Structures are given as C-alpha cells and as structure tokens.
Design a protein with these regions (language model features):
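A contiguous active-site-proximal alpha/beta segment in oxidoreductase catalytic domains
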Residues: 125, 133-182
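N-terminal glycine-/serine-/threonine-rich beta1-alpha1-beta2 phosphate-ribose binding loop
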Residues: 1-128, 137-152
C-alpha cells in the first residue's frame, strides 16, 4: 500500500471536507496509485461553489489542480492567477487533457448531467455538485455512463450527513418545530 491518496479515495472523501463520504460505501478500486503518483484534477465551473469545493479538496494530499474550465474567461483567469493550470473555455477541451484524472463539476444545475456524462466518456472520475440531475432520464444516463466507462461518480450531499440538518428534519417530522407550512 502506498502513502499517497488513491484516485477513488480522493473522490469519496472530497467536497464539504468529506463529511458525506464517511457515510458512503467504499467503492472498489480499479487502479491503485503509487506513492509518487498525483491525481490531476480539473475544475469545471469555478464559480462561488466551485471555489468552495476547491478549498475543501485542498485539505487532501496526493492531488493537484491541473486545469480549469469556465465560459467566463475573466473568472477563469482570476481563479488560475499565479497557477500553472491549463485554462479551457470549453469543458470538452479540459476533458481531452491527459493530465486530468478526475473532475469537479460545479456548473449551473442544468449542466451537471452533460458535464458528468462527457467526463465519464473521457475516462475521468467525477465529483458533481447537487443536484446531480434535473430529470430521471438524465440520472439514468449518468449511471449508464459511469458503469459503461468504469468511472466513479459522486454527488455532493453534505447537508444530508450533517447532524444539525438531520436533527432539524427530525424536529419537523416529530412536530417539535410546530406546524410547518409552505
């Protein structure tokens, strides 16, 4: 076993400081990374949430950001200032980069499925921000792509594993919070 992080472990423990990952089942590795291997990560959509996720992932070892993609060139330049990252306005160009092993998808919601499916088709593992998809059909297409291309796809759902959120849900369900109306 190596002291370095494994690509799939990276995805399972990423985002929100990895809170959701501890509750998630461990996935089987198809490739073990050696001690000198580094996971190259590309970020698709480095807006406010994308930058938060980048900060969360920075707590992990054994990876480095290698590329960033955003249709807003100014934002992309701001995020990559002083960094030796490739910049791609078209996310498909980022997916073609050999140095990218995995991607963080933090684009507007309606892009999540397409970005993730294309990433799987390119052989990249995916951490996608919620909502994972907007329709059942998109969800099925993502599952099919992940299975067909043997990729790990994890959807961020940190609030679902946060004790404060669970407690709040219990209060509402047990009517301890009073009658809740919308």
């Amino acid at each position: 076993p190596s002291d370095g992080i494994k690509r799939r472990t990276f995805l399972q423990t990423g985002g929100g400081a990895g809170l959701a990952a501890w509750a998630a089942p461990m996935l089987v590795m198809s490739r073990v990374w050696g001690a000198n291997d580094t996971i190259g990560v590309g970020v698709i959509g480095p807006g406010r949430r994308g930058q938060q996720l980048m900060g969360d992932f920075n707590r992990l070892k054994g990876f480095q950001y290698v590329a960033v993609s955003d249709v807003n060139a100014r934002r992309m330049d701001q995020v990559a200032v002083g960094k030796d990252w490739k910049k791609c306005q078209d996310f498909r160009a980022l997916l073609e980069l050999k140095e990218v092993d995995a991607v963080i998808v933090a684009t507007p919601d309606h892009w999540h499925a397409l970005n993730s499916i294309y990433a799987c088709m390119a052989g990249k593992d995916v951490y996608v921000e919620k909502p994972m998809t907007l329709t059942i059909a998109e969800g099925r297409a993502m599952v099919n792509a992940a299975r067909h291309y043997n990729c790990v796809v994890q959807c961020g759902s940190q609030q679902r594993s946060d004790a404060r959120c669970r407690t709040g849900c219990e209060w509402v369900r047990n009517q301890r919070a009073g009658k809740v109306t919308v």
